[in-house]
Amino acid sequence: MINFNNVKIFSGNSNLELAKKIAEKAGLQLGKAEIQRFKDGEVYIEIEETVRGRDVFVVQSTSEPVNENLMELLIFVDALKRASAKTINVIIPYYGYARQDRKSKPREPITSKLVANLLTTAGVNRVVAMDLHADQIQGFFDIPLDHMQALPLMARYFKEKGFKGDEVVVVSPDVGGVKRARKLAEKLDCKIAIIDKRRPKPNMSEVMNLIGEVEGKIAIFIDDMIDTAGTITNGADAIAQRGAKEVYACCTHAVFSDPAIERLEKSVLKEIVITDSIALPERKKIDKIKILSVDSVFANAIDRITNNQSVSELFN
């Protein structure tokens, strides 16, 4: 049970609807804050209620426009720190810059680590994120980070559709996603398949080979994010050509950079299951897309954090 007198929750502009749902699930009122832009683009934030001595949560996905939303979050944290908040906990449903988690070429930055440093220096006491692109990002922080998962929601959704057992196969779009695919396959009591993908250029992918059996089965792709949708749609075509009965896809983060929607609309995919970790504009809400809300996941995390209980037990 959350101590409502000691806890406050606020939202930036990136995903206000999700923040409202999280607050409602947690039994909290969304805090009042004025967020404006000066004519030159600078961010101005004023907290319009007292936060002195309170445990404060701020909901903000660092999605497109990434730099705007990140800077807004940092300024929000600074305002809370200067207003004497007891603890500042940031809920980042989608953690931008997560794909820049290592040096693959000489003289490249590791921007995921830079963002972690910026958040910590700004005054964040705890980060609550969901399905980070790379697990090692958790180690970039010198403050507690709770890593939420959307996979149980997706498993429940597909189970309710009757998708389980030998008639289903979970497909990883690349070798790096095998661990994620195996977890979903365990929950659906089915086998996995793996696509061997070669990427000649950024945001371009080419399907080369398939490991596993898909003929006559319902195939479910799973990934942490879909960006331009080239990987998923090329993979879906390859699976369909090899005799899959139906092809579905699911991901936590619907980045959906152009031309993702066009590709998904034209693809053989029957349904794309996503979460609301990123606010999806109305123009991108096509009939094929099913949105699952992660509001209860973060509301439960708030409850456990404020009561000094284990957050990881939510996923055991």
Curated annotation (Swiss-Prot):
Active-site residue list: 197
Binding residues annotated for D-ribose 5-phosphate, in chain numbering: 199, 223, 227-231
Keywords: ATP-binding, Cytoplasm, Kinase, Magnesium, Metal-binding, Nucleotide biosynthesis, Nucleotide-binding, Transferase
Pfam families: Pribosyl_synth (PF14572), Pribosyltran_N (PF13793)
Residues that hold Mg(2+) 2 according to the record: 174
InterPro entries noted in UniProt: PRib_PP_synth_CS, Pribosyltran_N, PRibTrfase_dom, PRTase-like, Rib-P_diPkinase, Rib-P_diPkinase_bac
Residue ranges crossing the lipid bilayer per the database entry: none
UniProt GO molecular function: ATP binding; kinase activity; magnesium ion binding; ribose phosphate diphosphokinase activity
Positions annotated to bind ATP: 40-42, 99-100
Name of the protein this chain belongs to: Ribose-phosphate pyrophosphokinase
The species this protein was found in: Fusobacterium nucleatum subsp. nucleatum (strain ATCC 25586 / DSM 15643 / BCRC 10681 / CIP 101130 / JCM 8532 / KCTC 2640 / LMG 13131 / VPI 4355)
